[in-house]
């Protein structure tokens, strides 16, 4: 099966378009969603979500937080360049499709490994995400993501020479 053709057939009205983090619409919707953000650092894949050829939202992947043992254990690697964090997922103009979120995640899961390899030369093992309350992560559950547990709620401060060696 040619999966690219498969998704074009079933989701022809839905697509992800890769953009730079400086794309004006991406920036606008990202800052509206995370007004206190200091920006995106590290490796990243940023997409505008299109439905019927109109932009309806954004989704992005970026380098994960450093030293999360649970992620490294799950992916069985100490190389944190082999998995990404779903750092933003925002639908601004929701179409009349109750499964739109899950469809977007499915396209992201199938296209991001290719995009990541083309951009960085590494094979992407997977994607992680954090879901903050009151959200429940229902779209991730519907897309069959594995639940790894709740975060400890630790804020990482970049202080001292060894901040990057701490494990959480």
Predicted regions: what they are:
Residues 1-43:
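Short amphipathic alpha-helix that is part of the acyltransferase structural core
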Residues 15-24, 44-45, 51-52, 58-167:
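Acyl-donor binding region in acyl/amide transferases
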């Amino acid at each position: 099966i040619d999966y690219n053709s498969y998704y074009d057939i079933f989701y022809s009205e839905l697509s992800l378009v890769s953009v730079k983090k400086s794309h004006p619409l991406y920036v606008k919707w990202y800052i509206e969603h995370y007004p206190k953000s200091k920006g995106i650092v590290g490796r990243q894949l940023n997409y505008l979500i299109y439905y019927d050829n109109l932009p309806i939202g954004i989704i992005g992947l970026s380098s994960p937080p450093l030293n999360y043992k649970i992620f490294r254990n799950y992916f069985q690697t100490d190389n944190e360049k082999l998995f990404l964090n779903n750092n933003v997922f925002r639908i601004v103009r929701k179409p009349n499709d109750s499964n739109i979120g899950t469809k977007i995640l499915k396209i992201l899961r199938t296209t991001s490994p290719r995009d990541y390899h083309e951009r960085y030369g590494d094979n992407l093992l997977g994607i992680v995400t954090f879901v903050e309350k009151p959200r429940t992560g229902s779209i991730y559950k519907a897309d069959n993501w594995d639940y790894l547990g709740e975060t400890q709620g630790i804020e990482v401060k970049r202080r001292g020479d060894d901040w990057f060696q701490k494990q959480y």
